[in-house]
Amino acid sequence: MIRSLIAFVALVALLAPASGAASSGTANLLWREAGPAVAGGRVTSVAGSARDPNLYYLGAAGGGVWKSTDGGAVWEPVFDHEGVGAIGAVAIDPSNDETVWVGTGESNPRNDVSYGDGVYKSTDGGKTWVNVGLRSTKYISRILIDPADPQHAIVGALGDVFADSPDRGAFVTFDGGKTWSKTLDVGPSSGVSDLAMSPGTPNVVYAGVWEFQRRPWTFRSGGERDGLYRSTDGGRTWTRLTGHGLPTGITGRIGLAIAPSDPKRVYALIESKHGILWRSDDNGETWMLVSSNTLVDQRPFYFSHVSVDPHNPDHVFTASTQLAESTDGGTTFKAIASDVHGDFHAIWIAPNDSRRMIVGEDGGYALTVDAGRTWTFSANLPIGQFYRVGLGNDNPYTVCGGLQDNNSYCGPSNSLDAAGNTNAGWFAPVQDDDGQWAIPDPRNANVIWSDGQDGALFIYRRRSREWTFAQPYLTNVQQNYNIATSPYRFNWESPIGFAPWDPRIVWFGGNVVFATGNGGYTWHPISPDLTRNDKAHQQPAGGPITRDVTGAEYTDTILDIEGAQVSRGEIWVGTDDGFVQLTRDGGAHWKNVTPPGANPNGRFETVAPSPLERGTAYAVEDANATGDGAPHAWVTRDYGAHWRSIVNGLPPDLWTRSIRPDNRNPALVYLGTEQGLWASYDRGGHWRSLRNNMPAVSIRDIRIQPQFDDLVLATHGRSIWVMDDIRPLQEAPQAVAAGAMLFAPRTSYEYNLTNNTEGIYTNYAAANPPYGVPITYYQATPQADAPTVTILDATGHTVRALTGENKAGQNRIVWNFTASPPVKWTGVANKAFQGPDDGATVVPGAYAARVSLNGRTFVQRFAVKPDPEATETLAQMQRSYNVFAKLNRIYSSVDK
């Protein structure tokens, strides 16, 4: 067992006079990154150093900026203190590795894209960052830095992909970001998809202009004014290139590259009905179509990246579903890197050594130092884009969730590996899907219900390693992407729910609610169509050039199904077309109870009934895909007859993604947004950020594990995060009102830890909870001397006395299940040989904690239990304790 004493201190909790709510007392309650890293996540931008072959940066779609100084073996997050985590572009100053530029907001605008707030710059290798402007651009595609003048930089901004915006185009600075000029502007609906600068003559710059706008049910990629633009004065002015071999008609996304060894050679990936890859050998004066091979660019709006070998103008790479290579100037291509995760978004080639490359893809990154013959990658980036999280009732409890691009994964909340929560404990219930929901059966956590995109539902039995396909309705119509003629429609994120009153009943959402009571063998609808069923919104997505029919834009479907714990038969439903529906009789009758003022095309991601109060439910709507980026959240206390908006105090442009009422404190509510978690102690009347030590990231789901009282978050960019033992959070208002308080410790387990080494799995280890019993107390002001926390056994005898922290606010120490240590051997000079720091490990049973705070003594009882898998009896544990206690008495007598 680990013998440790770990302390952390929370800040002072103050009362908000208007609401009686605890406002800032939870600022130092810490979140714990739980992983996993085994699946990686989408990397949108990569950059390396020409001078230092071990230095790399990468930007994640929703997971911030990461830096490696050892050739990719270890990565550290360097952007976690900033206000956003979505990254579109990363660039290292060619003249100074310490200067790094970051453009925020991913520019691959699929349905789960996250926004940014402009351009950041670091001059100390990522230690600190300064936002240098362009805050309203939202999605940045590329940053170019002049190798001859580091004060000269050009930024390509795609701009708001959900609405027309004046902040689209190319922006130029000549003073290192102090001031900016918008120099390429073709209208509010078109931005810049890519930029390329001539290495030898940096005044020559090419830009791809792209019209793109997304709606919840479709998107438009391409417009009349799109096309290729060129500047010969460093981006001050631009000229559109037309004719001379370039495609006619509407064009869409464009990817660009200039051959460093022959700057007259320019490559352009152009979304067009007339081809895919064009090449110019004369500085863009004339062009030729060199490839119409879809291997080069299979989904233009999502990929469209091209790169050229610095030493060979005919050696070309393209990033698409596969990484492709040409050695004949783009005429023919072959797929490479077959052992690397697919869906490639970024390529960087060392300018002085074309054998060294790094690529970014949907599973993270991959590196080569031999021109792509072999690739290395480590499962050490916890940047998973989870949609939902499901929690088991086992011990340690199982955590499951579905990830964009990377299946569903399940793992332990608390690893029994002393090294931490490594990738070794995580497993994929079903492979080969974009994961969405994954929930352990409440009766047996070894049975996992999970689904992939478009309603592909599976049941996985971990013990026997069997899986069953259990989708209620399978139709070739939906498989052929013509959902308008299908009787049932399933969302990219089709919801799964268990009835709280009978976990044998499982619900699955299409456009109706399906139910099964026999483990998914048979299903029946328990509702009519609960959506708007707007046929105009059920047509194939994409266009006008390329259709994109993956199912990500399927609409008029159900997003959430939740049953009320306090009322049998009460089921709440949220849809992706702006409805909240309710039944109070198990589905026999339904009522539309949508909050007034809801966006008719918004997504009700969560409708969460209170686990404590009848008739109370919270709803959150995300309407960003309609161009409405404001927060939307409501509460009802009368079954939806009346709703109250609860967005007071939230930033006006903060997308709302999830909501969850607390399971102990009826006034406490948690709100997940695009940039972190918020909490309210007055049912949503006022909000305070609960981000604390967590990076800015999209919070897609919020759950509470009731046995351990842990708050668990599904983030869309940084995997799973946990706040352990949230009773101090739940009872913060009472503590502040009392002036001092000892919170009741939770039941804790003497887990038997092991040291596990599993090859690549040791590349990543998330922190386990501190080993032992967390003991938390609140004091309004510090005392003259630090409080002593005394651990008592069931008879009232002292087991151990611990010196606590002495700060105003919440303080926490962890008792590690051990009795007082023996007296140190002071006759030995070397402290390592003076005796152990801990006494014998105690026997599971009843204990209490006692502490005096500002003249008052508090006692709270708690239980210590054995490892659930332990075979040793309590009598055997007692004998072991007696032996070690006797040895400690002998140790204590050595100096006497």
Predicted features along the sequence, with ranges:
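Extracytoplasmic/secretory ectodomains and luminal regions
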Residues: 733-896
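Bacterial N-terminal signal peptides
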Residues: 6-17
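Beta-propeller blade termini and top-face loops
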Residues: 21-763, 770-772, 782
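Positively charged n-region of N-terminal signal peptides that target proteins for export
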Residues: 1-4
